[in-house]
A protein has these predicted regions:
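Extreme N-terminal tail/first-helix region
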Residues: 1-16
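A generic local structural motif
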Residues: 4-7, 32-33, 105-106
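Generic alpha-helix detector with strongest preference for long hydrophobic helices that associate
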Residues: 8-9, 18, 35-42, 76, ...
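Solvent-exposed, well-ordered amphipathic alpha-helical segments
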Residues: 13-14, 32-34, 81, 123-124
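Short beta-strand segments
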Residues: 15-50
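Short, structured beta-strand-loop surface elements
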Residues: 51-124
Length: 124
């Protein structure tokens, strides 16, 4: 079902599986992946499982922070967005415990060191 403004706002209040489309940093072609977002204190974040190598989606956003945030649950919408990459340790330590709890993880230090983390700034 296409999203009304109220339905979109309601969908953004809770984390869920979405897709994002970034522009390939080398190819210039759109790259769409499935990922989960989190609403933490009214802000939208995307993270991932910790690992030392940076994900392609994050490298793409470092090259061009504009992307499309695709709601795809009960509400469908393609939302223009900009990524704010979060590298600063203190901010990561404030945000990632929420993600760790949602995923029932107990490796916060590894997440702070290795998990990708962006804040999603919707262009609305």
């Amino acid at each position: 079902m296409p999203g009304t403004i109220d339905a979109i706002d309601a969908a953004l209040e809770r984390g869920q599986t979405i897709d994002i489309t970034t522009m390939g940093r080398r190819s210039g072609k759109p790259r769409r992946i499935e990922i989960v977002f989190h609403n933490i204190e009214g802000r939208i974040y995307i993270s991932g499982i910790p690992r030392p190598q940076k994900r392609d989606w994050l490298l793409n956003l470092e090259a061009d922070p504009r992307f499309t945030f695709h709601l795809k649950g009960r509400t469908h919408a393609d939302l223009a967005a900009t990524a704010r990459i979060i590298d600063e340790e203190a901010e990561r330590r404030r945000i990632l415990p929420h993600v760790a709890r949602a995923w029932r993880r107990n490796d916060l230090d590894a997440m702070v060191r290795y998990s990708p983390l962006i804040e999603v700034l919707l262009d609305r």
